[in-house]
């Protein structure tokens, strides 16, 4: 029979922890948690004592009532237990309102916004009990109100509840609760009243206690104290001596919700919308989330964490809110600790990165600084970086820009392959081919800032070549960024590279058209010269100055203060220049030019400025170039870098037929075809030419360089022959006076005729004069002696070929009978 004598409390599935806080009517409340899942709860306990039968009966009534009443504003019942010795009521985790107010005193007290919403909830609970349940609470006071984790108020204390009209059956209150009784309780002459009159009087007592502290006696209700002015008229109705004047809870709620009322504020409006968010239209949800971020600063922290955040997560997962949930989501994320952030925010962020919604992607990139510290390296490399890199190839310039900027935050968490291979490959393509100058500039900026995270081999391959390419950019901020990049990463270059590779590039920038670029170049040159001079005077300092060259990882503070980093670094520099069309960049690139552009130049993609080649002297020959064309023409034999096309990707076509040994050749190594419109003063006709692939002879002109990547492709025979002809004195193809009459002919035959050795040679030219842009006489003699004769020869050959074709056609027409099956027509 031991089974029947066992204590039922031992099987209670909850552990009671924390200190017991005493409540009226013999109850006490403690914190607890479920034994199996560890869920937090609050445990209300009542010890049954002999001689307190009426109070025990009221406690049992409270247990019965709370089991059956279900309302969002009434304390939620979880579990309960009734034994001969005690009563247990398990509810959601809550704190008594009196304790909550005391805890908030140190932090400035409970705000009026919180109180307004709390009172709103209590009045709604009373309206439900009186109007829907026909019940009288009969115990509305501060000790009967509890606050949950989100700061929402719940109505409890159901010990003295009774059915409306059955006042005689109501349990008797204790002496400590008599101060909350309405005047008609003792004055039998006031028998005319409404069923809600007693509860509304108690509501007035609650309002007084919330603003002024515990109620000492009923007469204290006459003193308003700290009650807000907007609430005073409605408060006076509640504590009026005439019970008939006291409004119904629903009417009181409506009065306080009127314009200027105590319940008319953004906090209450937000809560009311969240309660009905599941039935709201998508357009209403969109507007709500857009305005929510502005109001969060004035909302309580606990409310944001436990009430708004779950709604935001639900709206993203099951709704169509989209990118508008991101700003409030990340703003609330600041209130979370690291574990909560990992549990609630990070899974949503990872899922968002796989979205194809552009607005979502750009918002994520813009807000990355808010959550990057909570992302671990495996998550970044496996789930985030593969989606982020798609932004490098997006057609929207704003997304490309934000993707570049985000690399500053992601780089420290990227693994070896993603950082040194994948990211560098995308940077290479952006810097060489992106049609937006500011994006090319920011790519250079970002490369300089993440240089400390690159491994030494990648730094040696990339930095000099990338910054050298940037100094050739037609966009002046990009050129300045290239110069500043050299200066910021000076500790990553050996003294040999400083003298042989870096300084020659910087010296070429000293004649840049932009004064700011020139000034930065001179500063950088002086810095490198001081470094070289220091080692020259004291060779023992060589090891100290080159200590970071082969260091695997260098502190990013090394490049932290480099002269403003191309105007504004990776702040919103691009927004000043990026436009919807391509003309904005052309205008920015040509800004400050002394000579006006021709119509043909305005339609061309960006071409790099030729600071190394001086403009040719004015010639008296009728076949001389326009001055604007000569100024931008590169020296083909010495510096073919300027043939690089900085225009849009659509205008640049990759050379075909070449074997690729690595991915870097795809992005950097191949020359690009470039169209140029040439004006001849004699005929004024415009002819398009296709320049051969750039013939780089300098280590500094290898794009992003990567000496192995650019030299793995063997030159073709035609390219080798063309190069040898240039060195022997043959002029570029652009110098011939092209005959427009032959434009309809076949271009292959025309170039074949040009490749034949000419019967006339210019004795005045020798191998040393190849690439000399200053010899006007040489240019004139070449065009006068060879240009016209070759054109005539080509025209004659085409005419002969045309005659042969016409003769064959005539033979076929003259032939009688049908053609044999299987015979293939040649023309």
From Swiss-Prot:
Gene3D superfamilies linked to this entry: Leucine-rich Repeat Variant, Phosphorylase Kinase, domain 1, Transferase(Phosphotransferase) domain 1
Record field: compositional bias (Acidic residues): 641-652, 774-783
PANTHER family: N-TERMINAL KINASE-LIKE PROTEIN, SCY1-RELATED S/T PROTEIN KINASE-LIKE
HEAT repeats: 345-383, 384-422, 502-540
Coiled-coil regions, chain positions: 788-817
Compositional bias segments (type: Basic and acidic residues): 630-640, 667-678, 792-814
Bias type Polar residues, positions: 679-690, 737-746
Molecular function GO terms recorded: ATP binding; protein kinase activity
Protein kinase domain boundaries: 1-309
Compositional bias annotation for Low complexity: 586-624
Domain statement: The protein kinase domain is predicted to be catalytically inactive.
Family designation: Belongs to the protein kinase superfamily.
Keywords: Coiled coil, Repeat
PROSITE patterns: HEAT_REPEAT, PROTEIN_KINASE_DOM
Its job: Regulates COPI-mediated retrograde protein traffic at the interface between the Golgi apparatus and the endoplasmic reticulum. Involved in the maintenance of the Golgi apparatus morphology.
Keyword Coiled coil among record annotations: yes
Keyword DNA damage on entry: no
Name assigned to this protein: N-terminal kinase-like protein
Top-level division of the source organism's lineage: Eukaryota
Disordered: annotated segments: 586-827
